[in-house]
């Protein structure tokens, strides 16, 4: 099929038009480069803008950080200033408190001084009054030997003794309606001049003279030797005296002399001195039977009631005395008062009276000497009642001590010595040593004490810092024992202790617990946490054995790592036959540094007591323990009437004693070095 020429021409024209149009729309290379450069310039400008913006932002951030740092520094400086101010305030408060305490102490000292001065003045007045009364009575007796004159009313001392003896005033021969001013004590026998014996020598108190009369001596109340010096038997004299005086009350026994108070002694001796002024004398042999003068009704009633008031106590003492002697026939009061005594006893009693006569008016020292001397005399009376008459002279001579020992005696020296002995482990020498490893602590589901020990505490730690560190485990209190480096944490419940131990680092090789705390100077410091398992407080080695207190020793100065089992093992290795061991604890069931060990044999017990100090050596520590007899409640072994608050651990004594008997027992020079023990009631626990 053929095309026409017109059609071809049209097609060619269309093609050329299209090509022309395409060339017009396609840009040239220059235009393309220009556009690319424009785009690059735009991108560079954008980049420059963004860089400048980022730099400005960084600068702003840096300035902000600098400002923040400056603010923090300012805050720290402010805090430091506040802390310094607080420290200054605390120091000022402490200084003020110290000043207040010093002022209070000064006021207390002034009050005590005033009280002491008042007491001294009262004592001086009382002594002066007593001396004046005694002088007046003696002068009155010397002036009127045939009668004893009384005032219309009784003196205060006479009235007190009459009330004590239950003697009504209406029955007194000195104060009746028929004779209200004086009464006669009996016929006046003819008196021959006789030189007094050394046993009845005069006693002087500064200027007053007391003749053959002793203030607080017991010579007038002793009957250990025969009364007569002319061969007349004492029993015959007693029978005649009792026949002529049916109102005489029987004495409880030969050696059980009834102790009287000082006022009773003075009054009763003054009664009988009236008879002495009429012809009787302690150094004279007794008069014939028909010349023995009867007692007045007042004397009979007084002596009878005094005997009845003391008989019950004396029976109890005599019933427990292993040296009790058989009862003797009854004696009259004259024989009881004027019986003679061996020379050794007279000399000793005279020395005591001399010591009493030299008492000064120096306040507290005088009062202590006075009370100590009375206690010594009471103990001396008790010992004389317990000692047989055949060996009494030898016993007194062996135990005799110079009067200066009792005159200069400090009644509180024994208490100070006992307190010093409690800390004797620091200076004592160990007699034996134990070396080894402590038994391991293996407990399943242990129960702890709510009290925990912290060791190695930073020196600058405060209570608030400790509260902040440990309050997360439970409510607690901080106890500062007073030494740097350790404290006690006291939680309310045992569960808090468990939580604390779980947060601690546990050294399984040694069983130690460590906890990290921070202070102002130390950011991280490990302190040792030492809990106490309640099962470690007691350990029984022989369950079938009975625990006896007389085979138990007290062990002091224990280390905190020593358990009851460890203590028992140590004592068993050293002395053997351990039955039980226990650790003493406080009210929170935490150890207080002492324990008890009970033995099954007396031999092991005595070996432990004789050791006194034991040194313990372990890989962790070395410690010296103090071993003493375990003390309980006991009666004095000598008088059997007072509480035995002191124990002599020396093997020559080894018994409980009261204060008076202790001084009397240890009067010889060879026994003054014995060490006293007292019971510490705060820490001692009964078995």
From Swiss-Prot:
Q: Which residues form the RRM domain?
A: 450-529, 551-628
Q: What induces it?
A: By neuronal stimulation with serotonin (at protein level). MicroRNA-22 (miR-22) binds to the 3'-UTR of CPEB mRNA and inhibits its translation while serotonin triggers down-regulation of miR22, thereby up-regulating CPEB expression.
Name of the featured protein: Cytoplasmic polyadenylation element-binding protein
- Subunit details for this protein? Exists in 2 different conformational states, a soluble alpha-helix-rich form and an insoluble beta-sheet-rich amyloid form. Stable self-sustaining active amyloid-like oligomers are formed upon neuronal stimulation and contribute to long-term facilitation in sensory neurons. More than 80% of the soluble form is found in high molecular weight oligomers, the majority of which have the size of a decamer or larger oligomer. The insoluble form binds RNA with significantly greater affinity than the soluble form.
Residue ranges, annotated region (Disordered): 139-159, 221-246
Q: Does the keyword Repressor apply?
A: no
Q: Name one GO cellular component term.
A: nucleus
Q: Which GO terms describe its molecular function?
A: identical protein binding; mRNA 3'-UTR binding; mRNA binding; mRNA regulatory element binding translation repressor activity; ribosome binding; translation activator activity; translation factor activity, RNA binding
Q: Which UniProt keywords apply?
A: Activator, Amyloid, Coiled coil, Repeat, RNA-binding, Synapse, Synaptosome, Translation regulation
| Domain of life of the source | Eukaryota
The record's listing under InterPro entries reads:
CEBP1_N, CEBP_ZZ, CEBP_ZZ_sf, CPEB, CPEB1_RRM1, Nucleotide-bd_a/b_plait_sf, RBD_domain_sf, RRM_dom
- Main location group: other
Pfam families noted in UniProt: CEBP1_N (PF16368), CEBP_ZZ (PF16366), RRM_7 (PF16367)
Q: What does this protein do?
A: Sequence-specific RNA-binding protein that regulates mRNA cytoplasmic polyadenylation and translation initiation. In its amyloid-like oligomeric form, acts as a translational activator. Up-regulated at activated synapses where it is required for the late phase of memory-related long-term synaptic facilitation. Sustained CPEB-mediated protein synthesis for at least 72 hours after neuronal stimulation is required for the persistance of synaptic facilitation. Activates translation of atypical protein kinase C.
Q: Provide ranges: composition bias, Polar residues.
A: 147-159, 221-242
Q: Does the keyword Magnesium apply?
A: no
Q: Which GO terms describe its biological process?
A: modulation of chemical synaptic transmission; negative regulation of cytoplasmic translation; positive regulation of translation; regulation of protein localization; regulation of synaptic plasticity; regulation of translation at synapse, modulating synaptic transmission
The record's comment about this protein's domains reads:
The N-terminal Gln-rich domain can confer two distinct functional states, a dominant active prion-like aggregated state and a soluble state.
Q: Which SUPFAM superfamilies match?
A: RNA-binding domain, RBD
User: Whose protein is this, by species?
Assistant: Aplysia californica (California sea hare)
Q: In which tissues is it expressed?
A: Isoform 1: Enriched in nervous tissue. Isoform 2: Predominates in ovotestis and is only weakly expressed in nervous tissue.
Q: Which family does it belong to?
A: Belongs to the RRM CPEB family.
List localization entries. Synapse, Synaptosome; Cytoplasmic granule
């Amino acid at each position: 099929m053929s095309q026409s020429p017109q059609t071809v021409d049209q097609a060619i024209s269309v093609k050329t038009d299209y090509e022309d149009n395409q060339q017009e729309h396609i840009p040239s290379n220059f235009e393309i480069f220009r556009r690319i450069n424009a785009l690059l310039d735009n991108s560079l400008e954008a980049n420059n803008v963004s860089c400048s913006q980022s730099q400005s932002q960084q600068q702003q951030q840096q300035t902000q950080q600098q400002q923040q740092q400056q603010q923090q520094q300012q805050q720290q400086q402010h805090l430091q200033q506040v802390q310094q101010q607080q420290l200054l305030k605390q120091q000022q408060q402490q200084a003020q408190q110290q000043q207040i305490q010093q002022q209070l102490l000064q006021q207390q000292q002034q009050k005590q001084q005033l009280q002491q001065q008042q007491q001294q003045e009262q004592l001086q007045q009382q002594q002066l009054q007593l001396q004046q009364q005694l002088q007046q009575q003696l002068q009155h007796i010397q002036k009127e030997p045939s009668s004893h004159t009384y005032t219309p009313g009784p003196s205060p001392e006479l009235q007190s003794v009459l009330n004590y003896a239950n003697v009504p005033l209406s029955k007194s021969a000195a104060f009746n309606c028929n004779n209200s001013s004086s009464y006669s004590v009996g016929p006046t026998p003819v008196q021959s001049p006789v030189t007094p014996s050394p046993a009845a020598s005069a006693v002087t108190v500064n200027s007053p003279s007391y003749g053959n009369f002793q203030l607080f001596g017991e010579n007038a109340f002793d009957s250990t030797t025969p009364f007569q010096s002319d061969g007349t038997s004492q029993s015959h004299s007693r029978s005649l005296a009792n026949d002529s005086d049916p109102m005489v009350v029987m004495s409880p026994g030969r050696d059980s002399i009834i102790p009287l108070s000082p006022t009773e002694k003075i009054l009763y001796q003054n009664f009988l001195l009236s008879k002495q002024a009429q012809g009787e004398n302690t150094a004279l042999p007794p008069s014939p039977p028909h010349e023995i003068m009867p007692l007045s009704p007042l004397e009979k009633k007084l002596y009878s009631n005094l005997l009845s008031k003391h008989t019950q106590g004396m029976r109890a003492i005599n019933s427990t005395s292993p040296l009790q002697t058989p009862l003797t026939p009854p004696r009259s009061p004259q024989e009881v008062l004027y019986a003679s005594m061996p020379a050794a006893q007279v000399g000793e009693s005279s020395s005591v009276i001399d010591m009493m006569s030299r008492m000064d008016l120096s306040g507290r020292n005088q009062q202590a000497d006075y009370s100590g001397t009375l206690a010594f005399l009471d103990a001396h009376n008790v010992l004389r009642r317990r000692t047989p008459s055949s060996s009494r002279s030898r016993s007194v001579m062996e135990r005799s001590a110079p009067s200066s020992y009792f005159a200069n005696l400090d009644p509180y020296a024994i208490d100070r010595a006992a307190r010093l002995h409690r800390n004797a482990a620091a200076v004592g020498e160990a007699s034996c040593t134990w070396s080894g490893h402590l038994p391991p602590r293996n407990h399943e589901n242990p129960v702890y004490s709510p009290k925990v020990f912290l060791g190695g505490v930073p020196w600058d730690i405060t209570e608030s810092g400790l509260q902040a560190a440990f309050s997360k485990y439970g409510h607690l209190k901080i106890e500062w024992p007073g030494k740097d480096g350790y404290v006690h944490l006291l939680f309310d419940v045992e569960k808090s202790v468990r939580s604390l131990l779980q947060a601690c680092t546990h050294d399984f090789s040694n069983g130690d617990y460590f906890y990290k705390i921070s202070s102002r100077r130390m950011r991280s410091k490990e302190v040792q946490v030492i809990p106490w398992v309640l099962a470690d407080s007691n350990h029984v080695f022989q369950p079938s054995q009975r625990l006896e207190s007389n085979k138990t020793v007290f062990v002091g100065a224990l280390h905190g790592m020593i358990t009851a089992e460890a203590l028992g093992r140590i004592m068993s290795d050293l002395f053997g036959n351990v039955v039980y061991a226990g650790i003493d604890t406080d009210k929170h069931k935490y150890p207080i540094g002492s324990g008890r060990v009970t033995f099954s044999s007396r031999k092991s017990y005595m070996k432990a007591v004789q050791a006194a100090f034991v040194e313990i050596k372990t890989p962790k520590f070395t410690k010296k323990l103090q071993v003493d007899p375990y003390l309980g409640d006991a009666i004095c072994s000598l008088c059997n009437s007072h509480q035995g608050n002191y124990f002599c651990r020396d093997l020559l004594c080894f018994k409980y004693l009261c204060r008076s008997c202790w001084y009397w027992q240890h009067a010889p020079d060879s026994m003054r070095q014995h060490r006293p023990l007292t019971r510490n009631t705060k820490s001692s626990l009964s078995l």
